[in-house]
Amino acid sequence: MFKRKSTAELAAQMAKLAGNKGGFSSEDKGEWKLKLDNAGNGQAVIRFLPSKNDEQAPFAILVNHGFKKNGKWYIENCSSTHGDYDSCPVCQYISKNDLYNTDNKEYGLVKRK
């Protein structure tokens, strides 16, 4: 698993870290920093590159349900986020009891109100 290091080696590493006060080198050439004008304002253009895999969405899709009943909130992520559409009890209830799916005429009347 882990190898024990000599205490002298550990002390040398600690001394090296203690010498760098902030723990960050401001002279890091690989880090990009926004250039500011005299007023302290900066501007940058951010480009979103296309995904390497065309089938995968370039963002994460998260489906959740949230509603209040009897003074209590129910907020949970839906299993349809992961493609499991059948095991979500909220989705099952909505599909069985939603007026749009069950009684389209009554849905039209409620929608008008």
Swiss-Prot record:
Domain notes for this protein: The acidic C-terminus is involved in modulating the ssDNA binding properties. The N-terminus LAST motif is involved in the cooperative binding of the protein to ssDNA.
Keyword annotations from UniProtKB, A to Z: DNA damage, DNA recombination, DNA repair, DNA replication, DNA-binding, Metal-binding, Repressor, Viral DNA replication, Zinc
Region (LAST): 3-7
Protein's GO biological process: DNA recombination; DNA repair; DNA replication; viral DNA genome replication
Organism annotation: Escherichia phage SV14 (Bacteriophage SV14)
Gene (UniProt): 32
Molecular function terms, GO-annotated: metal ion binding; single-stranded DNA binding
Record text on subunit structure and interactions: Homodimer in the absence of DNA, monomer when binding DNA. Interacts with the DNA helicase assembly protein; a ternary complex between the helicase assembly protein, the single-stranded DNA-binding protein and ssDNA is an obligatory intermediate in the helicase loading mechanism. Part of the replicase complex that includes the DNA polymerase, the polymerase clamp, the clamp loader complex, the single-stranded DNA binding protein, the primase, the DnaB-like SF4 replicative helicase and the helicase assembly factor. Interacts (via C-terminus) with the viral SF1 dDA helicase.
Tagged with keyword Metal-binding: yes
Pfam families with a match to the protein in the record: gp32
Binding site for Zn(2+): H65, C78, C88, C91
Alphabetical list of InterPro entries matching this protein: NA-bd_OB-fold (IPR012340), Phage_T4_Gp32_ssDNA-bd (IPR012339), Phage_T4_Gp32_ssDNA-bd_sf (IPR044947)
Protein name: Single-stranded DNA-binding protein
Coiled coil regions, renumbered to chain: none
Gene3D superfamilies given in the database record: Replication Fork Single-Stranded Dna Binding Protein
Record-stated family: Belongs to the Tequatrovirus single-stranded DNA-binding protein family.
Protein purpose: Single-stranded DNA-binding protein that participates in viral DNA replication, recombination, and repair. Coats the lagging-strand ssDNA as the replication fork advances. Stimulates the activities of viral DNA polymerase and DnaB-like SF4 replicative helicase, probably via its interaction with the helicase assembly factor. Together with DnaB-like SF4 replicative helicase and the helicase assembly factor, promotes pairing of two homologous DNA molecules containing complementary single-stranded regions and mediates homologous DNA strand exchange. Also promotes the formation of joint molecules.
